[in-house]
Amino acid sequence: VDGVRINQCKVDRQGRLFFGTMINEEQGNFLNYQKRIGSFYRFTMSQGLVELKDKVGLSNGIAWNNNWTKMYFVDSFDLTIYEFDYDLMTGNISK
């Protein structure tokens, strides 16, 4: 996508790649993050690219709890840590 870049990525225990995108800094000043053109994705060889969350301002931290039933994703523009139910078998998150 034009104007965005990958900012943060992590791999789960099953080898699935999760990553967030954000506006490319070359697009202007910090206020451009309000455009929320970033997204949060999962990538696997079998399923390809799957968008999990849209309208991300500033993609940051990705983590799971100890038993892999919760996933955490940070949108620093919102100063928010999102918590999702996480299915380790499928890689799906609650919406």
Go through the PLM ranges and name each one.
Residues D2-L17, I23-N24, Q34, S39, ...:
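Beta-rich, blade/repeat-based domains predominating
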Residues Q14, M45-S46, N67-W68, S76-D78, ...:
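Short strand-connecting beta-turns/loops that link adjacent beta-strands
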Residues F19, Q27-G28, I81:
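Glycine/Thr-rich phosphate-binding loops of Rossmann-like dinucleotide-binding domains
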Residues M22-N24, S76, Y86:
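Short loop/turn segments immediately following the C-termini of beta-strands
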Residues L31-N32, G38-Y41, T80-Y82:
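A short loop-to-beta-strand structural motif that recurs across blades of beta-propeller domains
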Residues R42-T44, N92-I93:
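Phosphate/pyrophosphate-binding betaalpha-module
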Residues V50-D54, I93-K95:
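Beta-propeller fold detector
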Residues F84-I93:
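Short loop/turn segments immediately following beta-strands, especially the blade-tip
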